[in-house]
């Protein structure tokens, strides 16, 4: 088995596949990446029984074949080699890597012990890659990282006719993003729960102009995604997220609007005096928003800015990190805050100007916290 591949091409491809490998696999063989060279294509595949990844790369194949190589080690090597073609020669159990004046000899892993990768399920529709990647990043930020509650580490993907709804929560905030997709056949309704980290990693790998094909197994336990030369399958999480339709308020007492960039900068400034897990108070009055951080006996900071308010004045406090996550993921220059009361949950949406209608396709619910003055 012998082939050549551009270093940059290999580094990008093996880097993506290797990220999907378990850091401490339950079975050592799962640390490997299957490398198949045939025709003018190099195919890299990884699998850990939960997630499978596959990418095709252009290569100059002199002798076809298949070998199992330690994935993370190959990724580390490809990352640091000079930017010239890399030559691979495989001789039984040894993999010889040559790049310019640098050479490595790697021990191949036993290919016959490697599990069979799952096939891509039946494609049920497609979505524009740019929109999908942005939507995933907007909701993934609120997914829990606590594996003690696996259901909260997922992103709910709801298919409702020609609308796809992504949603995630960590119990303290809830993000929803709606976007158009093209179902194959008769549009129907279904819901799946996908590991957030896996979905986000695939979204980050998308290239501009990619069309993402979405596939679901008939058993409803496997999701497949295919875009360009990349393919991924992952086992779905069991359970369901809370019903966001019941959590998001239907009626509000006040609506505040403020420029996103000014509020983000102000939050970062006043947060400098805060200890961990402290809150920032937002005092909305007609024409002004006042931010306060710190208590009477602590370091304090205040920032004022122009804002609009419809309805009752609001004096409310939030975790500043949660606010920043919501604000920085708005694709808008203005943020609209919809309040139920000074002690109730708030909903943040983007808008193009102070007088424009809010964009309801991206909604961010955040719970208030107590502020000690």
Swiss-Prot record:
Keywords: Antibiotic resistance, Cytoplasm, DNA replication, DNA-binding, DNA-directed DNA polymerase, Nucleotidyltransferase, Transferase. Gene3D superfamilies: DNA Polymerase III, subunit A, domain 2 (3.10.150.10). One of its GO terms (molecular function) is DNA-directed DNA polymerase activity. Transmembrane segments: none annotated. It holds the Pfam family DNA_pol3_beta_3. It is found in: Cytoplasm. InterPro entries: DNA_clamp_sf, DNA_polIII_beta, DNA_polIII_beta_C, DNA_polIII_beta_cen, DNA_polIII_beta_N. GO terms for cellular component: cytoplasm; DNA polymerase III complex. GO terms for biological process: DNA strand elongation involved in DNA replication; response to antibiotic. Forms a ring-shaped head-to-tail homodimer around DNA which binds and tethers DNA polymerases and other proteins to the DNA. The DNA replisome complex has a single clamp-loading complex (3 tau and 1 each of delta, delta', psi and chi subunits) which binds 3 Pol III cores (1 core on the leading strand and 2 on the lagging strand) each with a beta sliding clamp dimer. Additional proteins in the replisome are other copies of gamma, psi and chi, Ssb, DNA helicase and RNA primase. A homolog of the beta sliding clamp protein encoded within the biosynthetic cluster for griselimycin synthesis. Upon expression in S.coelicolor A3(2), which is susceptible to this antibiotic, confers resistance to griselimycin. The beta sliding clamp confers DNA tethering and processivity to DNA polymerases and other proteins. Acts as a clamp, forming a ring around DNA (a reaction catalyzed by the clamp-loading complex) which diffuses in an ATP-independent manner freely and bidirectionally along dsDNA. PANTHER family: BETA SLIDING CLAMP, DNA POLYMERASE III SUBUNIT BETA. Belongs to the beta sliding clamp family. This is Beta sliding clamp homolog GriR. It comes from Streptomyces muensis. The lineage of its organism: Bacteria, Bacillati, Actinomycetota, Actinomycetes, Kitasatosporales.
């Amino acid at each position: 088995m012998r082939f050549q591949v551009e270093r940059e091409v290999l580094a990008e491809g093996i880097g993506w596949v290797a990220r999907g490998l378990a850091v401490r696999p339950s079975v050592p063989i799962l640390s490997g990446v299957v490398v198949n060279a045939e025709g003018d294509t190099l195919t890299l595949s990884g699998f850990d029984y939960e997630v499978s990844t596959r990418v095709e790369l252009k290569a100059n194949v002199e002798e076809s074949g298949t070998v199992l190589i330690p994935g993370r080690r190959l990724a580390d090597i490809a990352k640091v080699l000079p930017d010239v073609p890399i030559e691979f020669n495989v001789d039984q159990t040894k993999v010889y890597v040559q790049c310019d004046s640098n050479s490595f000899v790697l021990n191949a892993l036993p290919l016959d012990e490697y599990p069979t990768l799952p096939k891509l399920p039946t494609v049920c529709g497609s979505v524009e890659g740019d929109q999908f990647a942005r939507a995933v990043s907007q909701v993934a930020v609120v997914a829990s990282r606590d594996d003690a509650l696996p259901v909260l580490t997922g992103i709910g993907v709801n298919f409702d006719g020609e609308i796809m709804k992504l949603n995630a929560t960590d119990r303290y905030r809830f993000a929803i993003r709606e976007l158009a997709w093209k179902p194959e056949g008769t549009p129907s309704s279904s819901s799946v729960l996908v590991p957030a980290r896996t979905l986000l990693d695939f979204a980050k790998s998308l290239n501009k102009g990619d069309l993402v094909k979405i596939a679901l197994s008939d058993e409803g336990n496997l999701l497949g995604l295919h875009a360009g030369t990349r393919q991924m399958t992952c086992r779905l999480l069991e359970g369901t997220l809370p019903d966001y339709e019941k959590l998001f308020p239907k009626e509000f007492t006040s609506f505040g609007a403020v420029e996103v960039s000014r509020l983000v900068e102000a939050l970062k400034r006043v947060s400098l005096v805060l200890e961990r897990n402290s809150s920032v108070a937002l005092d909305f009055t007609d024409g002004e928003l006042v931010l306060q951080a710190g208590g009477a006996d602590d370091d304090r900071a205040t920032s004022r800015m122009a804002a609009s308010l419809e309805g009752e004045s609001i004096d409310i406090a939030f975790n500043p990190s949660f606010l920043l996550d919501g604000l920085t993921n708005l694709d808008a220059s203005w943020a609209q805050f919809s309040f139920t009361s000074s002690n109730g949950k708030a909903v943040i949406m983007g808008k193009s100007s102070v007088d424009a209608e809010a964009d309801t396709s991206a909604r961010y619910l955040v719970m208030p916290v107590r502020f000690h003055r």
